[in-house]
Amino acid sequence: MQKTPFHLVEYSPWPLLVSLSLTSMPLGLIYYIRFGSIYLLLYGMLLTSIIAYMWWRDIVREATYQGHHTTYVVKGLKLGMALFILSEVCFFFAFFWAYFHSSLAPSIEIGSVWPPIGITVLNVFQVPLLNTSVLLLSGVSITWAHHALTEGKYYSTLSGLFFTVLLGVYFLMLQYGEYNETSFSIADGVYGSTFFMATGFHGLHVMVGTLFLFVNLVRTYYYHFSTTHHVGFLAAAWYWHFVDVVWLFLYISIYWWGS
């Protein structure tokens, strides 16, 4: 019988192993930049991915099959996810600060105009608008899946999650095509730097969110969630809505106002 409402974690090899694998990643990046060999970086990424899978597998077992995630543990997980999203807000705030700092008072080096001379901006009513529609629709579908889960509608939950994952993949494909069509690169001054840093990191978050939702899709298929206990699903939904909101700010500030 457990004496406290908190999960007292047992000894695990994963924290030590993941610290070693994470150490090899920046070392591999430095080695790649200096000598052009990418093998150490790929090794670190592969090893980190495997360890993360094994660690999260243990967490799923503890939560789903062993009942270690009590009400207090769930509250802590929700608070942790909320603080993580808050840190991500600060992360993107830095990119928006850099963009508006450069655009509201453009320097003489870029012609004192924004967008800078020589930059052909993307049409705001083409792929960017389609991307906005895709993400807004995905926000509707994940909300539909969440409501279906709380009401015990198994197949509706699966359908909503599957549709959201498809929209996430479609968004990434559109973003990749948009990058191939741009007439500027990340090396083309402050506009290219801020554009690709902000939209690129958002694309990375969409990729992570899509993987997060896919894991929840698999877990839903295997009946890991109930109408009252689905903190993993809730965390994925929060993260996806955060990605949606960030894109709206990107679309309004960079694609529409910045053009």
Swiss-Prot record:
What is the protein's major site of localization?
Answer: mitochondrion
Q: Which residues form a coiled coil?
A: none
Keywords assigned by UniProt, alphabetized: Membrane, Mitochondrion, Mitochondrion inner membrane, Translocase, Transmembrane, Transmembrane helix
Against InterPro entries, the record matches this protein to:
Cyt_c/ubiquinol_Oxase_su3, Cyt_c_oxase_su3_dom, Cyt_c_oxidase-like_su3, Cyt_c_oxidase_su3-like_sf, Cyt_c_oxidase_su3_a-hlx
Record-listed E.C. numbers: 7.1.1.9
Membrane topology, as annotated, equals: Multi-pass membrane protein
Where in or outside the cell it occurs: the entry states: Mitochondrion inner membrane
Reactions it catalyzes:
4 Fe(II)-[cytochrome c] + O2 + 8 H(+)(in) = 4 Fe(III)-[cytochrome c] + 2 H2O + 4 H(+)(out)
Signal peptide span:
none
Q: Which GO terms describe its biological process?
A: mitochondrial electron transport, cytochrome c to oxygen
Q: What's a Pfam family this protein contains?
A: COX3
Q: Which domain of life is it from?
A: Eukaryota
Gene Ontology CC: mitochondrial inner membrane
Whether Transmembrane helix counts among this entry's keywords is yes
Answer yes or no on keyword Mitochondrion.
Answer: yes
Q: Which GO terms describe its molecular function?
A: cytochrome-c oxidase activity
Membrane-spanning residues: 13-33, 35-55, 80-100, 119-141, 154-174, 195-215, 232-252
Q: Which PANTHER family match?
A: CYTOCHROME C OXIDASE SUBUNIT 3, CYTOCHROME C OXIDASE SUBUNIT III
Function, as annotated: Component of the cytochrome c oxidase, the last enzyme in the mitochondrial electron transport chain which drives oxidative phosphorylation. The respiratory chain contains 3 multisubunit complexes succinate dehydrogenase (complex II, CII), ubiquinol-cytochrome c oxidoreductase (cytochrome b-c1 complex, complex III, CIII) and cytochrome c oxidase (complex IV, CIV), that cooperate to transfer electrons derived from NADH and succinate to molecular oxygen, creating an electrochemical gradient over the inner membrane that drives transmembrane transport and the ATP synthase.
Give the record's family classification: Belongs to the cytochrome c oxidase subunit 3 family.
Q: Spell out the subunit comment.
A: Component of the cytochrome c oxidase (complex IV, CIV), a multisubunit enzyme composed of a catalytic core of 3 subunits and several supernumerary subunits. The complex exists as a monomer or a dimer and forms supercomplexes (SCs) in the inner mitochondrial membrane with ubiquinol-cytochrome c oxidoreductase (cytochrome b-c1 complex, complex III, CIII).
Give the protein's recorded name.
Cytochrome c oxidase subunit 3
Species source reads: Albinaria caerulea
Taxonomic lineage from the root = Eukaryota, Metazoa, Spiralia, Lophotrochozoa, Mollusca
Q: Which gene encodes it?
A: COIII
